[in-house]
Amino acid sequence: MNRLEDKVALVTGAASGIGAACARRFTDEGARVAGLDMVVPDAHPCAAFATADVRDAAAVRAAVEGLVAEVGPIDVLVNAAGVSSFGTADTIDDAEWARVLDINLKGTWHVARVVVRGMVDRGGGSIVNLASVEGIEGGQSQAAYNAAKGGVVLLTRSMAVDYGPHNVRVNCLCPGMIDTPMTAPLQDGNLKPVLEWFRDQHLLGRVGKPEEVAAAALFLASDDASFVTGHALAVDGGYLAGRRFPGTL
């Protein structure tokens, strides 16, 4: 079943990771996908692709307007562009704090505010933002990342309140640890114990796949979720449900 037949979907962060998985899945489900990222990947399924730094509001607006001219008005937006960061509140410097907040939170806002007006004018649409379990439950030594992703959750709910009367649904996904280029540095060296700890905290005993997050994004983007808005959906293998003691049944 093509759940996004005749829909136009804009996916940010579409060059890799969760964004790329969303672009592939949405294309498979019948959407014309417009990709947006810092670089154009060598291979992608998108009907059109543009480059922009989501921190640059003018560049975002120009890129989105160009994509709309090429593929048509946007029915679905997936804000998947993002970066990770480690550091406590007293050790992270101003530049890194700004980088993480500007990409993860301000970048989400930059794209959403351009796209949502067209959705309102056309009578509806669906926005899916990428937050994180760390936007719900603060993680150790991730002060900027936690703040940014928590902001994405509340930006999502704020937009759901404001645009619900216009039939624009706004939801977010809160993934756990997902096997992407962003988490690849955790697979080697002194950060590997962090990856192993996260894996063990997932009740399903493994890290997630980008395709699993894309499947959840598809649900929220499609009419299958036609009565869902303002929701933060965990795709976390049970991470937020609770903790288990080692060696117990």
Language model segments and positions:
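C-terminal helical subdomain
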Residues: 172, 192-224, 228, 235-237
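Short C-terminal tail/terminal secondary-structure segment
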Residues: 137, 218, 229-249
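Active-site helix of classical SDR
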Residues: 112, 148, 156
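Alpha-helical segment proximal to the catalytic Tyr-Lys
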Residues: 117, 161-165, 226
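Substrate-binding pocket helix/loop in short-chain dehydrogenase/reductase
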Residues: 88-89, 93-101, 194, 198
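Residue(s) in the substrate-gating loop at a strand-loop-helix junction
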Residues: 132
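Active-site loop immediately N-terminal to the catalytic Tyr-X3-Lys motif
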Residues: 90, 137-143, 165-166, 205, ...
